Amino acid sequence: MEQYNALLRYVFQVTEQELSSIGWQEREIIRAKFPTMEKADVIGWFDDDTLVSQVAVYPMEVRIFGKTYAMGGLTGVGTYPEYSNMGLMHRLLEQALKNMKKKGQHICYLYPYSIPYYRRKGWEIISDKISYEIKDYQLPKNRQVPGDVRRVKTDSEELKETYERYAMHTHGAVLRDELAWNEYWLWDSDDVMAAVYYNEKNEPDGYVIYWIANDVFHIKDMIFNNEDARTGLWNFVSAHFSMIDRVEGDTYTDEPLAFLLEDASIKEVISPYFMGRIVDFEAFVEEYPFRPSVLDREWKFTLMDPVMECNQGSFLLTISRDGHGEAKRIMEPCRDRISIQTMTTMLMGYKRPEYLAKIGRIQASEWTIDMLEDAIEQQTPYISDYF
């Protein structure tokens, strides 16, 4: 564990000063990470007794268009510079993906330190983060709602229940067990607080996780199941008007905040957040909920994958009228072509087939693109986790 932590700190240049700024000491990190690492699949290369390259995969679950998938959360990726360009990481990633395949983890998420690098290995962007800044005078005015907001402890069951209710109907969301919650809070300071919106039936319908420092109200995340919850939570934020100069926060949906505000001239910055990768295409499609149709549908194409052999070659994708998909390998050349990166971002709903064809990421007929547009749900992933 000490070598794992030392390698990550060296590669990502984490200093003692940076650790102490959020209240961490070296030994505390090791203790905090130990329960998570016990459940993780950690593999590495050693030079004698020295760990020189490593990856870790957390066993997780995610919701994809109403279905629960086992997911491998890739993290802890690092190689000492003197051991780079030896192919060590490529082989570790290949082994990690093979291990995921054996465990039935048909999709992999990661937070990238280098988008180009992971694209070369088969991952693609699947979600965004919108960072915003709202001046105190731009905050929404109080509006009456049937529920109320109560502050709770960040480790409370109320907070976990609120997230679970939200995640179960939210495409892309990680279903958080203790491992996922531990990772979610790991790098936050002790000043982080939480408030939950309860509806008129006393059910939790949303929360805001925040901290206040130097006259700034920082929002780590805000989730809500309906408009009443959204309004109630912003009422709570606006109630801090006399204490703050501005609000800074992040949101992980594809809906910019500006349109919802009376004074919409706020600062918003959209940036890529998580990347994803289909691990086993045939198995992924077997569980995937396509849209129903009055007709059966099919598509023959060549799939390209830079790492996983099981995803390389020609396939026939059939989609039944009730939306059940099946992918089978075929032994014939196909004119249509798509990479595993593009297949992932398309089936996850981050980018639409028509757009991907327009920019040359899919080679297929207009009829096929129209069929895919009709077959794939229109919803972009929400991912607010970090691991």
Stretches found by the model and what they are:
Residues 123-142, 226-387:
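Active-site/acyl-donor-binding loops of N-acyltransferases
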Residues 83-95, 228-232:
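Conserved acetyl-CoA pyrophosphate-binding loop and the N-cap/start of the following alpha-helix
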Residues 1-59, 66, 73, 140-179, ...:
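Short amphipathic alpha-helix that is part of the acyltransferase structural core
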Residues 74-84, 216-227:
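A short, internal acetyl-CoA/4′-phosphopantetheine-binding micro-motif in the GNAT/acyltransferase core
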Residues 40-44, 54, 76, 192-196, ...:
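Short hydrophobic/aromatic beta-strand element in the GNAT-like acyltransferase core
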